[in-house]
Amino acid sequence: MTNASRDEERLRLALREEPDLAPLLAVLDETIRVLDENGVEYLLMGGIASSCLGRERWTHDIDLFTRPAEAARVLKTLAAEGFETEETYPEWLFKARKDAQLVDVIFRSGGNTTVDDEMLRRAPTVPFMGRLVRTVPPEDLVVIKAIVAAEHTPRHWYDALAIIAATELDWEYLLRRARQGVRRILSLLLYAQSNDLPAPSWVIRDLLSLLEGA
């Protein structure tokens, strides 16, 4: 690439318009409405939850988290409202689409994490761009993102750090959830502590003890 081409690319990026979120938000509102009206249990995760609990960032889809036994009902409920649906990966993920917007129906996440009663009890209701949404608890989101973070998805790592920085976490609860990914959580918290984020030393010691007892 020539210097002129690089300058043109920098200018293009500098002038780039913010993405139009109106179509995504319209489908989000419809998804929430129809699931709530039908009494379907679900939580929001992914970029929307990360924006609510940690740092604002753009997202291109809607990530729902539901019980494995509830996933087919979520899909059926959305299909009845005109969503296109597919059982993409029967082990962990279904998909729905409407007006070119994607809804991921996740029922098994990193570390074999699934929705349970305690997660639903702890789920916060938080504002997101003018509406209220119910998200995965921040502690669970930190654990999930630490486990699924990879070289090609560094956003998960930085989402988790942002949640640690922005949210008062229940560390006892996080420790219970961390048993499915002790090494990942430990590495995240050590990195967080090295950057002066509020990662308690006693939590790190307890994670080390879990490793030693494994």
Q: What is the meaning of each model-derived region?
A:
Residues M1-A214:
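Compositionally biased terminal segments of proteins
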